[in-house]
Amino acid sequence: RICDTAIVYTITLETNDTMKLTGFADEASRDLATQIKATKELGWTAISARMIGDRNIHEMPEADFEKAADQLDEAGIVIPELGSLIANWGKTIDSDFGIALGEIERCIPRMQRLGTKMVRVMSYAQNPWGEDQNETERFRRLREIVKRFADAGLTTVHENCMNWGGFSSEHSLRLVEEVPGLKLVFDTGNPVFQRDRSKPQADGTFPWQDAFEFWKAVREHVIHIHVKDCQNPISDDVE
């Protein structure tokens, strides 16, 4: 632990059946020097990058990014995954798609500078259940997102979170079906606090998602895993 905060660790699944450990070092600190220190204390050489200071890597001023990239190089730390803000749970499907396109434009050269091959995206925020989820537009946007990264030789992975693909394992699998080239990052903690919208009950309710069942359903499409310690919600009316 650094700064009384633990790093959430992640796993990259390699094609030769090996696993490489990395972590969300911004869970330890937003300060890059402390992120590097925390990573090295664990004996790791990789960070799953999101925030440095108060900004995501693809939103940092150019001079600040170059300084950070040099620090990482000097420390011998690599970045296998960039956790972007693209189409994340904080953006609705009716938001301007130009926002995502701008993020992609800034993200690609920074991934290339860092030698990062994998970018984490989402499928936009969940609309309240029962309302139109605008699936067609979600698929259209994600196809364009994946294509732009693929054209640069980069792999796009979708995380099951508070987004459309996080409604259930069936929703995540539908994304893979509808969006050629899309891979998955599986988060072990996110199913715990969400209802499984693929399993309506007779009384109109939905059961809590089962993380292990979710994993078994999507595993053949997963190339990266977020491992979290998580508790079930304390009340059935809290999601």
Task: Label the model's feature ranges.
Residues K20-A25, I47-A49, I79-S84, V119-V121, ...:
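Hydrophobic faces of well-ordered beta-strands that scaffold small-molecule active sites
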Residues S48-A69, A125-W129:
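Glycine-rich, proline-tolerant flexible connector loops at the mouths of alpha/beta enzymes
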Residues Y9, R30-A33, K37, E41, ...:
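Active-site acidic/histidine proton-transfer and metal-coordination neighborhood
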Residues L82, V146-E239:
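Acidic/histidine-rich catalytic cores of soluble enzymes
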Residues L32-Q35, A63-A68, Q209-E213:
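Alpha-helical scaffolding within the catalytic cores
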Residues I52, A87, Y124, G189, ...:
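Flexible loop residues that form catalytic
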